[in-house]
Each structure stands twice: as structure tokens, then as C-alpha cells.
Curated annotation (Swiss-Prot):
PANTHER family: NADH DEHYDROGENASE SUBUNIT 1, NADH-UBIQUINONE OXIDOREDUCTASE CHAIN 1. GO terms for cellular component: mitochondrial inner membrane; respiratory chain complex I. It comes from Canis lupus familiaris (Dog). The keyword Disulfide bond does not apply. This is NADH-ubiquinone oxidoreductase chain 1. Its EC number is 7.1.1.2. It is an enzyme of class 7 (translocase). It comes from the Eukaryota. Belongs to the complex I subunit 1 family. GO terms for biological process: aerobic respiration; mitochondrial electron transport, NADH to ubiquinone; mitochondrial respiratory chain complex I assembly.
Length: 318
């Protein structure tokens, strides 16, 4: 039975990811005054299926000088971790209701760094290695602010369980009392998922394609799926943390609809940002974090710790 539960979680995620690629190409197309994919199926709706068939039927080439085991393990690990991070997400009921769901998600996102590092190193290519090193530095750096922002939100929530955030936000979304944190969180999620304007790991102009330059066919598709699964997952987390969807226990499907709409809007924001902004320079990316975001998040975290103590109140759900 539990196996069926897992399958019923994984298949919709993979479908959502497949159609997100289509949405991205359509949105970018219309923003650049062109049509986007419109040949395969009505209005190009079957394009993701055609892409999947093409990628998985091609021969998976491997450079002769690459380290075979790591080269193959890296994309599998990337997708496995991307899917594992969905387990504690309340939609409105999680697959496993963990006591420390937030901590689990942070740990999993930290592990994702290894798949990037292995793929870059195992490819035995200069471009792949530079891309991997950039990705690792960027991901590890932005995880610092993500963790501090999460801590501040959890102080208002009063528990490490994500499900209790639904109850905390019954009267007011947390974006109102913590809007500077929400802004920094959104930008940090962009950097964490390697999206434009922080897509330095894939800098086409300088690094060909970044850490996955030597990958083709199936393994490349796995990296691609992992990246987009992470994008949707990060937007879901943003929705749960700051835009608590309305939840009526007698009609949980209303919650799911509300929650999906908010996640979709945030995902389209990601695509809009990609269409609008040029890529950051690497030093600007690091300065933004270590000199701007980190001091600000630390100050706001201290503020959120001090406020309940000063007003002698306790957070809900303790």
C-alpha cells in the first residue's frame, strides 16, 4: 500500500515537471513575441511527450576519460533527492507527517550539492568542473540565508512541522509580518534552483552548458527533471511558508486548488524573471548574499526571537 502511495506522488510530479517545460517555452515564446512549440499535438500540448521519447531513445554517450560509476550515479541521485524532498510537503496532508519536516528538507537540499559536484568531477571536462564548482559555491552560500529565514518563520509557527503552518496562517498570511524575509526567500530560492538571473552554473556564453555539458539522452533528462522538480518544490514551500492556503478539513480539495493556483503563479513569476533579467556576474552574486542578505536575515531573525519575549507572548502551536 505504501508503495502505491509513493507512486501516486511521483507520477503527478513527473507529469507536472514535463508540462512545466512546455509552459516555460510557451511563456518565454509569447514574451519574445513568438509562438513557442505549436506543432506536436493541439497547440503543442504533446511536446513534452515527444521530448521525453526523443531523449530516452537516444544512445547515452559517455566520455572515455570519465569516471563511470559517479558519472551514472550523479543524475540518479539528483532526481531521487529532488523527489524525496516532496515527502513532508502538506498538500494538505503529507505522505509522511514528519516531526522535523523542515530539517529533513534542508538536509536533502544540502545533499543535492553532491550530485552536481560528482557530475562535474566525473565528466573529466574543464567546463563541467568549473560549472560544478560554481554551482556548489552558490548552492551552499544561499542555503545559509534559506536556513535563517526558515528559522524566523518557524519561530512564528512554533513547531518544526510544516502542517502546523496551515493553522498558523488561518487569520493572516506570514508574508505580511515578515515581508522582507519573504522577498529575500524568493530571491534565494531563485539562486538555490540555479535559475536566471543566477544561472551562472549553466552560463552558456562562457561554460557551454555548465556541469551537465558531457551528458546526453537519458542521464541529461534526469538532471533536467530534477531541476524542474526542485523549482516546483521551492515554490510550493514558498506558498506553505508565506501564503498559507485556506484549509477546511471537511473539504480538503479546496485547499489543494487554492494551493496549486498560488504555486502556479509563483512558478510563472520564475519564468517571467528569466525572460526579463540578464545574468549576474559571479562576484555580484556572492556580494548580494554575504554582504546584503546575510546581515539582514540575521538582524530580522534576532528581531523575531526578541519580539515574543518582549511582548511576553508565545507563538501558536507550541
Amino acid at each position: 500500500m505504501f508503495f502505491i502511495n509513493i507512486i501516486s506522488l511521483i507520477i503527478p510530479i513527473l507529469l507536472a515537471v514535463a508540462f512545466l517545460t512546455l509552459v516555460e517555452r510557451k511563456v518565454l515564446g509569447y514574451m519574445q513575441l513568438r509562438k513557442g512549440p505549436n506543432i506536436v499535438g493541439p497547440y503543442g500540448l504533446l511536446q513534452p511527450i515527444a521530448d521525453a521519447v526523443k531523449l530516452f531513445t537516444k544512445e547515452p554517450l559517455r566520455p572515455l576519460t570519465s569516471s563511470m560509476s559517479m558519472f551514472i550515479l550523479a543524475p540518479i541521485l539528483a532526481l531521487s533527492l529532488a523527489l524525496t524532498m516532496w515527502i513532508p510537503l502538506p498538500m494538505p496532508y503529507p505522505l509522511i507527517n514528519m516531526n522535523l519536516g523542515v530539517l529533513f528538507m534542508l538536509a536533502m537540499s544540502s545533499l543535492a550539492v553532491y550530485s552536481i559536484l560528482w557530475s562535474g568531477w566525473a565528466s573529466n571536462s574543464k567546463y563541467a568542473l568549473i560549472g560544478a564548482l560554481r554551482a556548489v559555491a552558490q548552492t551552499i552560500s544561499y542555503e545559509v540565508t534559506l536556513a535563517i529565514i526558515l528559522l524566523s518563520v518557524l519561530l512564528m509557527n512554533g513547531s518544526f512541522t510544516l502542517s502546523t503552518l496551515i493553522i498558523t496562517q488561518e487569520h493572516m498570511w506570514l508574508i505580511f509580518p515578515a515581508w522582507p524575509l519573504a522577498m529575500m526567500w524568493f530571491i534565494s530560492t531563485l539562486a538555490e534552483t540555479n535559475r536566471a538571473p543566477f544561472d551562472l552554473t549553466e552560463g552558456e556564453s562562457e561554460l557551454v552548458s555548465g556541469f551537465n555539458v558531457e551528458y546526453a539522452a537519458g542521464p541529461f533528462a534526469l538532471f533536467f527533471l530534477a531541476e524542474y522538480a526542485n523549482i516546483i518544490m521551492m515554490n510550493i514551500l514558498t506558498t506553505i511558508l508565506f501564503f498559507g492556503a485556506f484549509h477546511n478539513p471537511f473539504m480538503p480539495e479546496l485547499y489543494s486548488i487554492n494551493f496549486t493556483m498560488k504555486t502556479l503563479l509563483l512558478t510563472i513569476c520564475f519564468l517571467w524573471i528569466r525572460a526579463s533579467y540578464p545574468r549576474f556576474r559571479y562576484d555580484q552574486l556572492m556580494h548580494l548574499l554575504w554582504k546584503n542578505f546575510l546581515p539582514l536575515t540575521l538582524a530580522l531573525c534576532m528581531w523575531h526571537v526578541a519580539l515574543p519575549i518582549i511582548t511576553a507572548s508565545i507563538p501558536p502551536q507550541t
